[in-house]
């Protein structure tokens, strides 16, 4: 029997002899700051994830239903076709517009995330690279969410749904980057574990809040998800230790090729293709 040699993690501080107590951004957090990093990213994963799940699973399908005259807040409500006087076939009536909304959102998100990632890396402010994006993204998400909650047509709904993909990327992408930048290798497993727990709790909480909200009226889920979005970016910044200024970092010109490179699959990587195919099939089955 033989023991396989583990593949080295080329980004690990243990490999290149960097101090594992120092983060990538050069900071050495104190014990209190490590605790704030842990609970800050845990709270952020709940605050950012819960409203997003509530929108995707409950609020937006109900907005589609309301657009086509079906009020899910009224028990036993059946939409009547004014032309024939007969009940509308709800499932077949709503399946296609909901599918269009989902596809539009996926395509927009595919471009939004790498774009925001590149722009965030090049942000130079006294507040740091990630803080302005998280605060601004949360507030912008709240504003767009309130617009989506209005009784608007399917075309306008799709347009603002695209806007929300970019706004949510402004909130979520810098948060993910902050974990890799601000957490030293020594504490990364623990903080990432709590972040994962927060993601699961946020998903469960989002579904529950969406289901409870729609019991009152179809706008209620949009109102409290907007509040959560507005709070999420601000609360995360307040809980986490202050991000160091990026104003002194060298400026980098925006290069669109860096955005496009993130959309290209890695060459000569069959393992990636298999994992990508498996992930796609899994998500298609869940969806």
Question: Where are the predicted features?
Answer:
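Juxtamembrane intracellular "pre-TM" segments in multi-pass secondary transporters
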Residues: 9-35, 243-278
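Helix-loop boundary and gating motifs at the non-cytosolic
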Residues: 19-106, 273-278, 282-287
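Hydrophobic core of transmembrane alpha-helices in multi-pass small-molecule transporters
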Residues: 46-47, 144-145, 154-171
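Glycine-rich segments within core transmembrane alpha-helices of 12-TM secondary carriers
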Residues: 109, 189-214
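Cytoplasmic membrane-interface "Motif A"-like loop-to-helix N-cap segments
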Residues: 122-137
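C-terminal ends and interior cores of transmembrane alpha-helices
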Residues: 135-152
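Cytoplasmic helix-loop-helix junction between adjacent transmembrane helices
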Residues: 166-198
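Symmetry-related core transmembrane helices of the 12-TM Major Facilitator Superfamily/SLC fold
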Residues: 220-238
């Amino acid at each position: 029997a033989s023991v396989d040699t583990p593949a080295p993690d080329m980004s690990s501080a243990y490999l290149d002899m960097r101090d594992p107590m120092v983060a990538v951004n050069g900071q050495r957090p104190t014990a209190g700051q490590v605790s704030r990093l842990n609970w800050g990213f845990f709270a952020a994963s709940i605050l950012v994830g819960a409203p997003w799940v509530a929108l995707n699973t409950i609020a937006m399908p109900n907005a589609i239903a309301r657009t086509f005259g079906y009020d899910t807040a009224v028990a036993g409500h059946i939409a009547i076709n004014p032309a024939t006087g007969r009940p509308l076939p709800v499932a077949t009536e709503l399946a296609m517009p909901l599918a269009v909304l989902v596809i539009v959102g996926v395509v927009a998100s595919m471009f939004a995330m790498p774009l925001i990632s590149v722009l965030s890396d090049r942000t130079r402010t006294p507040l740091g690279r990630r803080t302005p994006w998280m605060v601004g993204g949360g507030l912008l998400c709240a504003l767009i969410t309130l617009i989506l909650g209005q009784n608007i047509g399917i075309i306008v709904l799709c347009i603002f749904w695209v806007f929300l993909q970019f706004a949510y990327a402004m909130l979520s992408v810098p948060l993910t980057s902050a974990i890799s930048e601000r957490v030293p290798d020594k504490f990364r497993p623990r903080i990432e574990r709590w972040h994962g727990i927060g993601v699961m709790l946020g998903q469960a909480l989002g579904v529950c809040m969406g289901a409870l909200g729609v019991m009152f009226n179809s706008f209620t889920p949009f109102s409290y998800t907007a509040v959560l979005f507005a709070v999420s970016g601000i609360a995360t910044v307040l809980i986490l230790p202050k991000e160091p200024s990026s104003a002194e970092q060298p400026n980098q010109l925006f290069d669109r090729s860096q955005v496009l490179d993130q959309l290209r699959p890695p060459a000569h990587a069959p393992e990636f293709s298999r994992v990508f195919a498996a992930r796609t099939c899994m998500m298609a089955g869940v969806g």
